[in-house]
């Protein structure tokens, strides 16, 4: 009899065990079964029909491979929405996301390519088949083919004073970004103000400038800039005079000459004379005689006391700034220029000067043409070039938001691999919430959410996590972030049943109760223990339906393998 009861008990335990195993399997695989629902119809890129998860098996940006009955189907999204990719080192984020999409997306792409691997693998195919002009921005390398200067004449001559001022302000904010070690931001802010003055003066007077010229401004030779028509010319040179004062010829003071050389006065602060001269400059043309005849003291004003601006006049803001620097305390000014030189040091490099002395393209060309821009920076040069790379990325991004575009062929992708390495890019972090109607797609790629928090702060990390439409998550060891993702997905409510028996009763007798409990749809352990070749996809608005797909490794795809390592030719030979 005892053996009979033991057999019944073991069978009961086996049934209960199998039941819970099945329930667990259903729960664990729940998120693998939602994609067919989202893709149950025949999707076409650009279709006006709305689909639940904006995913398709046809075209767009590939997030992974869906395992069908007999094949792996590439799964895309074609909306102009941004993506965050979290993948630890060695997980294959480059091989599974960046490379396959660069071999597939036909429109313009801007690619952060620290190792140069993406260029080597994809540039040739993009040039010869996808018909993209190829540029490489590698200022300290030997294969730079891109010129980038946000102050190029082609750009600046289209701008009025307010837009010129906004441009130099934005560039200044990017260069003079404060870090945690900066104990007194006063000097950094003053150095930025000095940058704005130098740059804005050049843009207003010459309609152009370069980083090298602006970086060299505090130490350049100001002697040629003191105009012979200016009263400060007589403070620089020994000038010819008569009983009636200094002699002028054609409105210009005449310097005394000895041995063919103008005779300068000793111990003259020529830089200070230039600031004073600019403080009296009325017109943008330095040769205009009205700059030197006292007109600055008799400018026409409106009823509110504002100077009435006429064509060719220099904005009074520049004169006021020049006057401020002319009156600055010598010791304080020296400290400001020291901080200025520290931030601007990178732009004094002759290699950087060559890479930033003109502009290879206009921002609108990224929409009008197909352009692939690879930003290749050696690991050892990242800290040095980070300010320049930030300026390049933010200049492109901001100018792409000046005009709306919903045409697929005008879409621009920004592949921001290891973007945290280049310092804070606050504007780019906010772009996912703004860029949809402008056709700009940002692909943020990083090794962990913890790195975003380290370089940007917890709040900024929360912003980028909440504004992207898609997340592609590889197997990770970050328990805190795995829990965060699990909480985003949410929980399901399931029924539970408990059974209790009286002492000595094995099966019969006792009581049972039914209750409910919350159960993670996707647990932190699920995330941390997915297979190496799998990814989890979260879609905004559908996070309760996470997808588990196969990673789209290019080296496992014969078609993609046939597209890599093509030769890159000079653009003029192809186009």
Residue spans for each PLM region:
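N-terminal pre-Walker A segment at the start of P-loop NTPase domains
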Residues: 38-74
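P-loop NTPase motor domains
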Residues: 15, 23, 27, 59-62, ...
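Glycine-centered flexibility motif
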Residues: 46, 64-65, 172, 206, ...
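N-terminal accessory nucleic-acid engagement/regulatory domains that precede
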Residues: 1-46
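Conserved ATP-driven motor cores of ASCE-family P-loop NTPases powering translocation/secretion/packaging/pilus
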Residues: 432-434, 438-536
């Amino acid at each position: 009899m005892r053996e009979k009861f033991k057999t019944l008990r073991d069978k009961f335990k086996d049934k209960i065990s199998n039941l819970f195993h099945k329930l667990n399997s259903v729960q664990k695989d729940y998120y693998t079964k939602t994609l067919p629902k989202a893709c149950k119809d025949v999707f076409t890129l650009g279709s006006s029909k709305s689909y639940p998860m904006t995913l398709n098996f046809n075209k767009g940006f590939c997030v992974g491979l869906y395992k069908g009955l007999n094949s792996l189907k590439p799964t895309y999204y074609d909306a102009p929405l941004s993506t965050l990719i979290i993948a630890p080192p060695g997980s294959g984020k480059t091989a599974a996301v960046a490379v396959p999409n660069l071999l597939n997306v036909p429109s313009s792409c801007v690619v952060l390519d620290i190792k140069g691997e993406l260029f080597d693998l994809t540039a040739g195919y993009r040039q010869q088949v996808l018909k993209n002009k190829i540029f490489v921005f590698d200022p300290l390398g030997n294969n730079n083919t891109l010129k980038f200067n946000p102050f190029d004449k082609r750009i600046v001559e289209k701008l009025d004073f307010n837009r010129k001022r906004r441009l130099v302000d934005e560039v200044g904010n990017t260069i003079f970004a404060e870090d945690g070690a900066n104990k007194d931001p006063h000097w950094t802010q003053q150095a930025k103000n000095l940058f704005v003055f130098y740059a804005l003066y050049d843009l207003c007077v010459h309609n152009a400038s370069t980083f090298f010229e602006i970086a060299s401004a505090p130490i350049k030779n100001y002697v040629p800039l003191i105009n012979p028509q200016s009263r400060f010319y007589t403070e620089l040179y020994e000038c010819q005079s008569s009983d009636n004062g200094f002699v002028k010829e054609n409105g210009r003071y005449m310097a005394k000459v000895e041995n063919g050389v103008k005779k300068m006065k000793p111990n003259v602060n020529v830089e200070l004379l230039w600031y004073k001269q600019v403080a009296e400059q009325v017109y943008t043309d330095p040769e205009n005689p009205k700059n030197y005849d006292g007109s600055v003291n008799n400018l026409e004003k409106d009823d509110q006391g504002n100077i009435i601006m006429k064509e060719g006049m220099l904005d009074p803001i520049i004169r006021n700034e020049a006057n401020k620097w002319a009156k600055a305390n010598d010791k304080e000014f020296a400290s400001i220029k020291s901080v200025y030189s520290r931030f601007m040091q990178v732009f004094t490099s002759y290699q950087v000067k060559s890479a930033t002395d003109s502009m290879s393209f206009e921002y609108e060309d990224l929409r009008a043409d197909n352009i692939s821009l690879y930003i290749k920076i050696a690991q050892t040069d990242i800290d040095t070039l980070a300010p320049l790379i930030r300026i390049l990325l933010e200049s492109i991004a901001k100018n792409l938001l000046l005009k709306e575009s919903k045409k697929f062929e005008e879409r621009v992708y920004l592949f921001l691999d290891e973007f945290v390495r280049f310092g804070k890019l606050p504007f780019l972090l906010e772009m996912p919430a703004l860029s949809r109607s402008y056709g700009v797609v940002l692909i943020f790629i990083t090794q962990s959410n913890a790195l975003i928090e380290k370089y940007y702060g917890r709040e900024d990390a929360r912003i980028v996590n909440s504004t992207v439409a898609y997340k592609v998550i590889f197997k990770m060891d970050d328990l805190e972030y795995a829990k965060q993702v699990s909480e985003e997905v949410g929980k399901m409510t399931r029924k539970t049943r408990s059974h209790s028996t009286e002492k000595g009763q094995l099966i019969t007798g006792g009581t049972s109760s039914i209750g409910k409990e919350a159960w993670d749809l996707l647990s932190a352990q699920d995330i941390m223990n997915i297979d190496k070749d799998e990814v989890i996809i979260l879609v905004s608005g559908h996070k309760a339906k996470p997808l588990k797909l196969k990673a789209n490794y290019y080296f496992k795809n014969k078609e993609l393998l046939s597209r890599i390592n093509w030769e890159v030719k000079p653009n003029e030979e192809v186009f």
